[in-house]
Amino acid sequence: MGGVMEKFHGAYVAIITPFINGEVDEQSFVDLIEFQIANGTHGIVPCGTTGESATLSFDEHKQVMDLAIKTVAGRVPVIAGAGANNTLEAIDLSESAKESGADAILSVAPYYNKPSQEGIYQHFKAIAEAVDIPMFLYNVPGRTVVNIAPETTARLAGIDNIIGIKEACGCLEQISDVIRKCPEDFIVLSGDDFTSMPTNVIGGKGVISVISNVFPKGMAEMQEATFAGDWDRARQLHYQMYDMMKQMFAAPSPAPAKKALELMGVIREGLPRIPMTPIDDDNLANLKLAMKGLNLI
């Protein structure tokens, strides 16, 4: 690697969207981005699942994208969340991301309406043909109730500007099948912190990470260790972060990550937006233990 991380490889943070008094907290968001870059994060992914995109208005979505791109100022790549289960809406969000100057977009499989594999293909094909910007597919069947089959991913990989996938199926067998079926330059990023290291072992190129919100240095170092072939160090870091990885999803995400960032003083208020709710006292106690284990508090 020559010490330089290739574009769209490594530890990308699925960054939270801070709120205060019910509005986007721009100052906390800027502070969080600076915290990320100072601690080695390789890229920023705003307006994804962890960014509570489902409860952002279109104007807020653009506000967050614009602020992320302006704050990053070219220091690391920005992959903007631009997905929707309405293909026309996904095209609008993708056009907005391109206008804002995003390096790429992340587009989730259509959720709730449960399309066939052909429907999934046509959805992503329509977006790719409408907006000329590098595009990552996003497979997260635990949330969307549809799985992008490896054969469909391979078919979509034949479209020029579809350059990779965030694979959050949680199944190494499927991830292996995707890597095996797709061209060598197709970028497979883990969508789960737990599978981030093993995904790189089998040919993945990085992760879009939740734990990176609170421990960016650890995830970035683990990714760099895998690319350097230092598997002992990568494994050590994986298990060092293990308890915190569990706590990030001990309550519905991103509530634990937001509370942790509040406790660390990185953001002013760690409340998610309804229908997400703050973590309870038991989860808070466990979160604090995991944070102390990483010397975060």
UniProtKB/Swiss-Prot annotation:
Localization, UniProt: Cytoplasm
Keywords, ordered alphabetically: Amino-acid biosynthesis, Cytoplasm, Diaminopimelate biosynthesis, Lyase, Lysine biosynthesis, Schiff base
Gene Ontology terms for molecular function: 4-hydroxy-tetrahydrodipicolinate synthase activity
Record CDD domains: DHDPS (cd00950)
Binding site for pyruvate: 50, 208
Site (Part of a proton relay during catalysis): 49, 112
Disulfide bond sites: none
One GO cellular component term: cytosol
Catalyzed reactions per annotation: L-aspartate 4-semialdehyde + pyruvate = (2S,4S)-4-hydroxy-2,3,4,5-tetrahydrodipicolinate + H2O + H(+)
Signal peptide (from-to): none
Function: Catalyzes the condensation of (S)-aspartate-beta-semialdehyde [(S)-ASA] and pyruvate to 4-hydroxy-tetrahydrodipicolinate (HTPA).
Quaternary data: Homotetramer; dimer of dimers.
UniProt-recorded name of the protein: 4-hydroxy-tetrahydrodipicolinate synthase
Lineage: Bacteria, Pseudomonadati, Thermodesulfobacteriota, Desulfobulbia, Desulfobulbales
Gene name tied to this protein: dapA
